[in-house]
C-alpha cells in the first residue's frame, strides 16, 4: 500500500494520514502485515511517530528517506529528526534517485550520509527503489548511480539494500 501525502502533484504536506478516521486502515494494515509506503516530507515526522506509536505492528516504508536534508554535511544535524526514527523497528527506508543524486549535496556527500544511515538503521531496513520510469535516465544508469552511492558499504550491506530487504517486505519476491 502506498500513501501519497506530498509530491510533484501535491506540493504541500498533507496530514490526513494521522487523522483518527484513518485508524481502521492502520489496524487493517497491521493485522494483515501489509507494508505501508509513506511518501512524505520530514515536516510530517511527528505525525508519523504518532502513527507508529499507536500502531507498533504496522510496517512503514519511508519513501525517499522523507527527503532528509543533507546539505549541512556531517554530522547531518539538520536530519536529526529523521535519524531519531531509527528506534522504530517497524520502519524501513526506501532509497531512490532523489536521495542518491540530490540537487545539492552542499557539504554532504553520499559516502558520509549513507554510512550514517546504515549505522543508524541497519542495512536490513534499507531498500533501493528505482522510481523508474519517473526518474531521469535508463534503469541501468539509475542502478549504476545507486550502486556508486553505496560503494562505501560492505558487500553484505549492499546485498540487503539491493534485494534482501525487498524480499523481507514482500516475501513473494523471495520465491
Predicted feature locations:
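Active-site metal-binding loops of divalent metal-dependent hydrolases
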Residues: 65, 130-132
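Mid-to-C-terminal alpha-helical segments outside catalytic/metal-binding sites
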Residues: 115-116, 121-127, 134-175
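Short beta-strand segments
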Residues: 94-97, 128-129, 162
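Conserved anion-binding
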Residues: 39-40, 61-65
Amino acid at each position: 500500500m502506498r500513501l501519497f501525502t506530498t509530491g510533484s502533484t501535491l506540493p504541500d504536506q498533507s496530514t490526513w494520514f494521522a487523522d483518527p478516521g484513518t485508524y481502521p486502515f492502520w489496524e487493517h494494515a497491521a493485522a494483515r502485515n501489509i507494508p505501508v509506503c509513506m511518501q512524505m516530507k520530514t515536516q510530517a515526522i511527528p505525525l508519523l511517530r504518532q502513527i507508529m506509536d499507536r500502531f507498533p505492528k504496522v510496517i512503514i516504508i519511508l519513501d525517499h528517506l522523507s527527503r532528509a536534508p543533507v546539505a549541512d554535511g556531517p554530522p547531518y544535524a539538520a536530519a536529526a529528526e529523521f535519524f531519531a526514527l531509527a528506534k522504530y523497528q517497524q520502519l524501513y527506508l526506501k532509497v531512490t534517485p532523489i536521495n542518491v543524486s540530490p540537487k545539492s549535496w552542499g557539504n554532504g556527500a553520499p559516502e558520509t550520509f549513507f554510512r550514517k544511515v546504515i549505522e543508524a538503521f541497519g542495512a536490513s531496513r534499507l531498500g533501493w527503489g528505482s522510481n523508474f520510469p519517473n526518474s531521469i535516465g535508463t534503469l541501468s544508469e539509475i542502478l549504476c548511480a545507486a550502486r556508486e552511492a553505496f560503494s562505501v558499504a560492505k558487500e553484505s550491506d549492499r546485498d540487503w539494500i539491493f534485494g534482501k530487504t525487498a524480499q523481507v517486505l514482500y516475501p513473494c519476491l523471495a520465491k
